[in-house]
Swiss-Prot record:
Pathway: Purine metabolism; IMP biosynthesis via de novo pathway; 5-amino-1-(5-phospho-D-ribosyl)imidazole-4-carboxamide from 5-amino-1-(5-phospho-D-ribosyl)imidazole-4-carboxylate: step 1/2. This is Phosphoribosylaminoimidazole-succinocarboxamide synthase. It comes from Acaryochloris marina (strain MBIC 11017). GO terms for molecular function: ATP binding; phosphoribosylaminoimidazolesuccinocarboxamide synthase activity. Its EC number is 6.3.2.6.
Length: 245
């Protein structure tokens, strides 16, 4: 599919306009970043792999009643999507202690949480995407109390759907990041992507704490075999039928 006018370039995707103002085209990139883009690199075929994974997972979520911005996948590394105004909050759902949760609380890596934890981060690269309390979200007027609760409930629904789906893939969903956006007619949609870039995924067949990692932590922590891990996730995800859990 030919691309239209360049709109903007992010860390993982280039976004183009199309003939329809309500539809955008995302070109997924092989670029990899970590630590707020302080670390940069390239992962072989990451664009195609992440686009394929995100496409399949959006279809799974749509089948389960979650409205997303996904339209179709015209090429292996391209996704057509509905244009949205992104809510400036990153919604992180955690099922197992890892990453910044361990650093900030002293919880040991791998400790299962008694219930999913939903965190909200300010989507602002200049500030380092800080963790926000509910009161700070309202102080900054980033959303309303009603929409914040809607985001939380949607995130928890998506979490349960994805936990079940990844279980069928032999993968544990440790935690993941979501972004949402509003359409021109004020419909709230799941946006951005769901992929090894945005999720922590552990291989159920591996007990070794290094070998089990199937996500961007392999890049962050210089564990090697990043492209191989991403490809394994894609193979397992695409092998699963799209169904209503």
């Amino acid at each position: 599919m030919s691309t239209g006018e360049f709109l903007y370039e992010g860390k993982a995707k280039i976004i183009y306009r199309t003939d329809d103002p309500d539809i955008l085209l995302a070109q997924y990139k092989d670029d990899a970043t970590a630590f707020n883009a302080q670390k940069r690199g390239t992962i072989t075929n990451k664009g195609r792999i992440n686009c394929a994974i995100a496409t399949h997972l959006f279809k799974v979520l749509e089948a389960a009643g979650i409205a997303t911005h996904f339209i179709d996948q015209p090429n292996p590394d391209q996704m057509r999507m509905r244009a949205v105004q992104i809510v400036p909050l990153e919604v992180v759902v955690r099922n197992i202690a890892a990453g910044s949760l361990c650093q900030q609380t002293g919880l040991a890596l791998g400790v299962p949480l008694s219930q999913p934890l939903v965190d909200f981060y300010y989507k602002d690269d200049a500030l380092g995407d800080p963790l926000l309390t509910r009161d700070r979200i309202f102080l900054l007027e980033l959303t309303t109390p009603e929409q914040l609760e809607q985001l939380r409930q949607l995130a928890l629904r998506i979490n349960q759907i994805l936990i079940n789906f990844f279980h069928q893939c032999g993968i544990t969903l440790v935690d993941f990041k979501l972004e949402f956006g509003m359409t021109s007619d004020q419909q709230l949609l799941l946006a951005d992507e769901i992929s090894p870039d945005t999720c922590r995924l552990w291989d159920d067949a591996e007990s070794d704490p290094t070998r089990r990692v199937m996500d961007k932590d392999r890049f962050r922590r210089d564990l090697g075999e990043v492209d191989t891990a991403y490809a394994r996730v894609m193979e397992r995800v695409l092998a699963q039928d799209i169904y209503v859990p």
